[in-house]
Amino acid sequence: MLNRISNELLLLNKIHTMQKYLLILILFTTVQVFSQTKVDNARFKELMLDSTAMILDVRTANEVQEGKIKGSINVSYFADNFLSEVERMIPKDRVVLVYCAAGGRSAEACKQLKKAGYKQLYDLQSGYNGWE
């Protein structure tokens, strides 16, 4: 009888421990999902005031000829060496403001940068086409 109670207590302890790990996993996943933030023009401009922030334009060279956000660095998302170029130019501890033409490529670029270890990514939701 004592052995059975002991086994049941061990089982309950294991279940409790698994619940803790599951909660930690859920919290970690939530933080990862929201570490890339879509922002509107007003918020993007506020973030630009941070002197340590870096602005990354992921459009093609032809698109950049039409204009760009002042102070931005251009690395085309379609470049074979996209990630290595960004890593060479932008430290991973910096706030990175990312934009493309309409918001699609910048969202994909942010996913790739997040996987590479960038923590503070902000994606201009309307892209350069919606920039004022």
What does each of the following model-derived ranges do?
Residues 1-18:
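Short, Lys/Arg-enriched N-terminal segments with co-localized hydrophobic residues
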Residues 2, 19-21, 33-53, 62-95, ...:
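Rhodanese-like catalytic fold shared by cysteine-dependent sulfurtransferases
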Residues 7-8, 23-25, 42:
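Short helix-onset patch at the extreme N-terminus, typifying the N->h transition
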Residues 11, 26-27, 66, 112:
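Enrichment for repetitive, rod-forming helical segments
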Residues 26-34:
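Hydrophobic h-region of N-terminal signal peptides that target proteins for export
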Residues 55-57:
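Structural scaffold elements adjacent to functional motifs in cytosolic proteins
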Residues 99:
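Short, surface-exposed ligand- or partner-binding patches at beta-edge/loop junctions that are enriched
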